[in-house]
Regions:
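ATP-dependent carboxylate/acyl-activation modules
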Residues: 106, 112, 325-327, 448, ...
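Phosphate-binding loop of NTP-binding sites
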Residues: 7-10, 88-220, 224-234, 457-464
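Active-site beta-alpha connecting loops in nucleotide-dependent enzymes
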Residues: 48, 324, 342-417, 464
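Peripheral docking tails and interdomain loops at the edges
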Residues: 439-459
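Short amphipathic alpha-helix with an adjacent loop that forms part of the alpha/beta core around
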Residues: 173, 428-436
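Short acidic-hydrophobic, aromatic-tinged amphipathic segments that line or gate anion-handling sites
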Residues: 79-83, 255-257, 419-430
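N-terminal leader/targeting and accessory segments in enzymes
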Residues: 1-90, 94, 358-362, 366, ...
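Acidic, Mg2+-coordinating active-site environments of NTP-dependent enzymes
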Residues: 69-75, 181-337, 362-365, 390-399, ...
Length: 464
């Protein structure tokens, strides 16, 4: 992370120093428990927590300064601003404007993080600065931008996530992307965004606020939304083989195909499933059974080509990539094979994961479906959960468990025999049941349900 001159921080934020530090500042941190010597602590008010209460702890941890809304009579130098979160955004925007290398902005309803990780891999991890985990909100984006350094990095890949109106205005304005990537527009965060058209309109602001004329790479079905139709002249459109082309110049269209690869690991084990993406006659094997991940990998490949990565490096890096952070892969523990995709969920990603799990599991193996509720779907939540429940075709030897509120778990279970399913509000209540099951186990749900707690291993890391 680059160092900052205290006077620059004051200029970017419009703040005033009280006891200005005499040394350069070595990065930013908003969690006093994780402060490193030389950093500046940002006192943010997050939910019920007020960062101003932790100034002394930050100082003890080695902070050389703090950004505050209200100063405290302690030795620690403090930069007083009107709003700490706005100040953080101003710092992120300032550092973005100083970065001279290509910046890729990624958004979408699902698949943002896996697409970001794939593109980071394709561009070369050692020289690519990217969002950590899914740190993609009003705090995460400027914190990510604060690590930009043109002397150390050749590319930046920044993920932007929203769940309410007007968020992307702030994020897109900070990111100022040179290249935009949209994974998809699906039913996610409907609670505050209310419709798919509204979601598309909000997410399109990433491209609207990007560098003038910067391209946007997207799948053809995203052009059904008015917000993206307006951007079609800037689009690089991925089109599945056999699908009619939109009315665009041929140079804007990239044909691709996703095909499945299977390797049988034995009569009592799940198949080793993977996907293959074909673009312009080149085949790229992908270590995930998810068709959604494969389709988004196609976006990352096209982005890497646009940014000048040579074909041999792209192919080598695609083959080396592995899903991470509990996002779409198979893992076997003795007599159990888990399909692990439990970082988050919405109706589209849930349907894709169920399809991948069912295709990856031989017919003779019993299946246990564990579905956490899908949050932030607003008034349509019950209908979406009921529709997903109807996708489960349980055989006599199969079982299901649904974790979440009574309303949503009952919606999941509406088409399933009570003798074959469990509805619960807490994952802890089904641990012993899962531990005793022999067969293939599906795990997916919204983040709050922590379905990874059902895994035998305690060493899986959600944010590698």
């Amino acid at each position: 992370m680059p160092s900052f001159d205290p006077q620059d921080l004051a200029g970017w934020t419009g703040g005033s120093w009280f006891n200005e530090p005499k040394v350069a500042i070595e990065g930013l941190c908003f969690d006093a428990r994780q402060i490193k010597p030389g950093q500046c602590f940002i006192a943010l008010k997050i939910s019920a927590r007020d960062g101003h209460e932790f100034l002394e702890q930050a100082a003890r941890g080695g902070a050389v300064a703090a950004i505050v809304e209200n100063t405290k009579p302690i030795v620690l130098p403090q930069l007083k601003v009107s709003d700490s979160l706005v100040a953080l955004g101003a710092i992120g925007a300032a550092l973005r404007s100083k970065f001279s290398k290509p910046v890729v902005g990624i958004t979408g309803s699902c698949g943002k993080t896996s697409t970001k990780e794939m593109l980071r891999c394709l561009l070369g991890e050692d020289r690519t600065h990217a969002t950590a985990g899914n740190w993609n909100n009003r705090i995460g984006v400027p914190m990510t931008l604060s690590g930009l350094d043109s002397n150390q990095q050749d590319f930046a890949v920044i993920e932007a996530g929203i769940n309410q109106p007007n968020e992307m205005v702030q994020l897109g304005g900070m990111i100022q992307a040179d290249l935009n990537v949209l994974t998809n527009i699906e039913a996610a965060h409907l609670e505050l965004l209310s419709s798919l058209e509204n979601i598309a309109s909000e997410k399109s602001l990433l491209a609207e606020l990007a560098k003038p004329g910067s391209p946007i790479i997207l799948h053809v079905d995203s052009l059904r939304f008015n917000a993206y139709k307006k951007l079609a002249h800037r689009a690089i459109v991925l089109l599945p083989e056999g699908v009619a082309a939109p009315d665009l110049p041929s140079k804007q269209i990239v044909r691709y195909k996703v095909s499945e690869q299977m390797e049988n690991l034995g009569a009592n084990r799940a198949l080793q499933a993977s996907q293959q993406v074909t673009i312009n006659g080149q085949n790229y094997p992908i270590a995930s059974p998810s068709e959604g991940i494969a389709s988004n990998t196609a976006l990352a490949i096209v982005a890497a080509k646009y940014l000048g990565i040579v074909e041999s490096d792209i192919r080598k890096r695609v083959e080396a990539w592995r899903p991470s952070g509990n996002r779409g892969y198979l893992e076997t523990f003795r007599e159990q094979t888990f399909y692990i995709d439990c970082y988050n969920a919405n109706p589209s990603s849930m349907a894709d994961a169920l399809d991948a799990f069912d295709r990856s599991t031989p017919q003779n193996i019993a299946r246990f479906y564990v579905l956490g509720a899908m949050d932030e779907l607003g008034t349509t939540a019950s209908a979406h959960h009921e529709a997903i429940g109807h996708l489960l075709k349980l055989r006599p030897q199969d079982r299901a468990a649904f974790v979440g509120s009574k309303e949503l778990t009952n919606a999941y279970a509406s088409a399933i025999s009570p003798q074959q399913c469990i509805c619960t509000d807490n994952v802890e209540k089904i641990k012993s049941t899962i531990a005793q099951f022999q067969g293939a186990i599906f795990l997916k749900g919204s983040r709050k349900y922590s379905l990874e707690k059902l895994l035998p291993s305690k060493n899986l890391n959600l944010n590698p």
